[in-house]
Amino acid sequence: MQTPKRRRGAQGCPRSSPSPPLLLLVRAVWFCAALSVAAGSFELTILHTNDVHARVEQTSRDSGKCTGQDCYGGVARRATKIRELRAKHRHVLLLDAGDQYQGTVWFNFFKGREVVKFMNSLRYDAMALGNHEFDNGLAGLLDPLLKHANFPILSANIRPKGSIASNISGYILPYKIINVGSEKVGIIGYTTKETPVLSNPGPYLEFRDEVEELQNHANKLTTLGVNKIIALGHSGFSEDQRIARKVKGVDVVVGGHTNTFLYTGSPPSTEVAAGNYPFMVQSDDGRQVPVVQAYAFGKYLGYLNVIFDDKGNVIKSSGNPILLNKDISEDQDIKAEVNKMKIQLHNYSSQEIGKTIVYLNGTTQACRFHECNLGNLICDAVIYNNVRHPDDNEWNHVSMCIVNGGGIRSPIDERTNNGTITLEELTAVLPFGGTFDLLQIKGSALKQAFEHSVHRHGEGMGELLQVSGIKVVYDLSRKPGSRVLSLNVLCTECRVPTYVPLEKEKTYKLLLPSFLAAGGDGYHMLKGDSSNHSSGNLDISIVGDYIKRMGKVFPAVEGRMIFSAGTLFQAQLFLTWGLCVSLLYFIL
């Protein structure tokens, strides 16, 4: 922070009385310093959440169902910390960067009413739309969220087309100017332009380039005399950084979508930091722009303090996400409202399906980066559901299943309730209500799909394919588009099923989520037409029936997906290089 000039800081200082001189001198110095800061700067505290995904109740360490003592998050605990920080700081904004919808039985049952109720109760100041806010179509966004929220809902890069424009006019705003004390703060929203392939917004919404639209509205705000601008949105950490670099006038970026954990210092829980908090980006016009996210699932509350000079420039930013653990009590009024709504859920969510005797790893860190045993279980269940009577040529008509890692939304802990799996827990794993469909596809297109699976591996996106009836070997040291070293599939025209090399010109049958069959997550090569695509059963019904039939499940990680020695060598090389640089730094 820049030190104010002495003459300016001295203006208006009271004269000291002779008695008692020391006490009065201290008070005078304190008062003058406070006056100096107030005259030349403005401090803003930004509390923020992103990717909460219907975690109304407190959760386990890995954001599944919590029944023990080691619990995190939940709206009641968040309310306590927000109230505390509002009392501590004078100028506070509470913001959400999207994806409040979808993820637990709460959303499946209440369809977003729970989101509106508790966001209103916590008095959010603004929210940006995430892709999952469109999971129930535009109608499911309009009512309840858009019609009943007591706070502005923002996205500058969504443009309605045709008659739909009049239906949502005034509900989705590009920006909002909020009076904070004597200052005006502009907040511009943005939503990932990948939303049409990630969710269900329908054909009448256009998702434009984030940077271009943000710049247009930042220019408008500047013209209106607003010199403190926050970009609040849901496009992922890489896009957040691009916005910070490219958009003139944006002072702070509050993001979401990639569940990015940023932290300065030693992390307080199991999440590994992707960088410091705030993550500082130098803009193309030479400014330092803080970029923040707060992981996901309401486990943390983002906590950023920003000091602006009198021209609206950021001169200091600091903070860290606050871990909402058991040391923070739950607000009893909010807790009572949660329990009241929970009564309606009980019969729906408490149905017992079966048991697991192993941890079903459905975490982001597992299923989006490598083979996960919950992905194996899901696809094995889908194959089992499609076993038919053999004939003279085939033991079964289909042997292969894929599911995108981003479609697996929660783990199931075998140490909770003696391994009992309830409908609530299974709904948290597969919350989207999709089907597993049958597709006929050429081997060349399937190979292309597996290249797409790892084209940006390591960024935590949801495209990585979990499989059954397929064995794939990747080399991430190669360029995207040429990373599949081998792809073997389980034969069907055989008496003893074995894995054989994929034939590019052969047509195969493949089981996959309806989301992927519609081209979701960028899998345009899987998008089928009515001649080669047959709709199947509900995903949660398929997996639930399989678990019921098995009674107890214990899926393993089996080497269905392998990253080659070349990839491992590259990782070791980067690690060694990083250690050498660190060692050299300390030596010098």
Swiss-Prot record:
Cofactor(s) of this protein: Zn(2+)
Annotated site residues (Transition state stabilizer) in this chain: 132, 135
Molecular function, one GO term: metal ion binding
Chief localisation class: membrane
Lineage of the species this protein comes from: Eukaryota, Metazoa, Chordata, Craniata, Vertebrata
Lipidation (GPI-anchor amidated serine): 564
Residues involved in Zn(2+) 2 binding: 51, 99, 131, 234, 257
Glycosylation sites: 167, 347, 361, 418, 532
Post-translational modification: Venom 5'-nucleotidases (or a part thereof) may be released into the venom via exosome-like vesicles. They may be attached via a GPI anchor to the membrane of these vesicles. Soluble forms of 5'-nucleotidase might be released by cleavage of the ectodomain in the exosome-like vesicles or venom gland cells.
Residues the record lists as binding Zn(2+) 1: 51, 53, 99
Record flagged with keyword Disulfide bond: yes
Binding site for AMP: 368, 404, 409, 432, 515, 521
Protein name: Snake venom 5'-nucleotidase
